[in-house]
Amino acid sequence: MSQRWRLATGGCINRSRPLRFFFNGRVLTGYEGDTLASALIANGIRTVARSFKYHRPRGIVGVGAEEPNAIFQVGEGRKTVPGLRATQVELYEGLKAHSVNGWPSVEFDLYAINDLIGGLLPAGFYYKTFMWPRSFWKRYEHRIRQVAGLGWAPDA
């Protein structure tokens, strides 16, 4: 397996045990002992998320619990878990991870238009703008949460 961004030797991984995993629908490979973050970096994945308000590209910048950007939805269906940091998820065979705040994808995010119209979006604008009509709040709330990219609850 050729991973351009991985050191040829060293590290705390078992190079004799490759693992296949999925990130945003793409099949990638890593090794036993990798974290999701280290495997993504080794595979050359640089943009893993988008910023909350302006949807600017974000990459992995930390190595532990302090990582602010690489927060994913891991698993599917009833076993999905939102809000996991890639630096704290140990890679396993068949792992499925999804970015939570880029639409239709983190590479091409249509909500990045917010960066261009940022001057029209003061802090907290969504709390003041979407107050009426009151009956529409459920629709507004769903869309605001989707744009913020906070993940979704497991299926019942």
What role is predicted for each listed range?
Residues 1-17, 38, 42, 47-48, ...:
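Terminal leader/tail segments of proteins
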Residues 1-2, 27, 34, 76-78:
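A broadly conserved detector of short glycine/acidic/proline-rich loop/turn motifs that flank catalytic sites
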Residues 7-9, 25, 58-59:
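Short secondary-structure capping/turn segments at boundaries of alpha-helices and beta-strands
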Residues 12-25, 156:
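Long, low-complexity, intrinsically disordered polar/charged segments
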Residues 15, 29-31, 36-38, 80, ...:
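Residues in flexible loops and secondary-structure boundaries
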Residues 22-52, 61-71:
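N-terminal amphipathic, basic-rich helices that act as targeting or association modules
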Residues 52, 57-156:
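Fe-S ferredoxin-like electron-transfer domains
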